[in-house]
């Protein structure tokens, strides 16, 4: 559901800036780009996306002008690489556009600098890896965060903390006036799925981990990836493409990737996903 969250973030940016041009990093997950195109695009929209393994800040900047509503960047990206986004954020803001950062693996936030620290205006995340099994592809949990000044443009509703008549702490649904049963065509979102159970599982898991547990989990992921990375580098015909990564990286193989993945599965090993399967 991180893809849906990303599409909603783009829609939100368009409302805020009142612009229709969207620039998407070439290293965004191609299926996320498809969801954006399906949910957001209209005759008035101009979406710039061309899937590639090359993330170059200068090339992205060259596509940004004063007609752009937002720039969408995944970090770590589809190929597993991690990026510094401060320069991109600064230029994006200078053009009056918003920076949307997509975090496909939320556990990475236990080690990496947060999107907000790098200048993101809106953050869209996939939270499946905390408390939610794979479920044959879903449902998962889409997460979204934004700067305080944009909070009223968030889709759906917000759960707010308050006190009852006895002074006891309680929670209420606030800003629900943005939803379609009240605002109809002027609603900020028209998605009606409810991932409450997934959200609850995510919240319980995160609460049990706590701050230190979350950081430890992130570190374990990274260290395991480094161990595999170092092993693969010693094998003939294997070329690791990434200079920096969190818990995933891209490997060029001496044989067809689909064949390799199939052979590994026979040995009980999930070897990853052939890039060509998702890029075509």
For the regions a language model picked out, list residue spans one by one.
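Active-site C-terminal subdomain of aminotransferase-like
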Residues: 130-243
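Short, conserved phosphate-binding/catalytic loop or strand-edge motifs used
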Residues: 2-5, 279-280
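Conserved PLP-enzyme active-site core in the AAT-like
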Residues: 4-170, 251, 258-264
């Amino acid at each position: 559901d991180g893809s849906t969250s990303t599409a909603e973030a783009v829609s939100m940016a368009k409302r805020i800036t009142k612009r229709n041009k969207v620039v998407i990093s070439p290293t965004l997950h191609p299926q996320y780009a498809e969801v954006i195109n399906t949910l957001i695009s209209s005759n008035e929209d101009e979406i710039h996306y061309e899937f590639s393994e090359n993330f170059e800040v200068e090339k992205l900047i060259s596509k940004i002008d004063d007609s752009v509503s937002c720039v969408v960047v995944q970090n770590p990206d589809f190929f597993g690489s991690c990026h510094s986004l401060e320069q991109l954020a600064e230029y994006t803001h200078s053009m009056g556009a918003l920076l949307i950062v997509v975090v496909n693996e939320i556990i990475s936030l236990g080690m990496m600098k947060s999107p907000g620290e790098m200048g993101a205006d809106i953050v869209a995340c996939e939270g499946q890896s905390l408390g939610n099994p794979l479920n044959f592809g879903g449902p998962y949990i889409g997460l979204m965060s934004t700067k305080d000044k944009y909070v009223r443009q968030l889709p759906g509703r917000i759960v707010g903390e308050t006190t009852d008549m006895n002074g006891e702490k309680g929670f209420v649904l606030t800003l629900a006036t943005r939803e379609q049963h009240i605002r109809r065509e002027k609603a900020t979102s028209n998605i009606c799925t409810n991932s409450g159970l997934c959200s609850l599982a995510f919240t319980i898991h995160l609460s049990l981990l706590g701050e230190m547990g979350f950081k430890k989990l992130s570190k374990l992921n990274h260290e395991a990836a480094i161990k595999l990375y170092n092993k693969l580098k010693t094998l003939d015909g294997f070329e690791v493409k990434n200079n920096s990564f969190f818990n995933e990286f891209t490997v060029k193989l001496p044989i067809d990737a689909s064949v390799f993945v199939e052979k590994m599965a026979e040995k009980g090993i999930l070897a990853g996903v052939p890039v060509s399967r998702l890029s075509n």
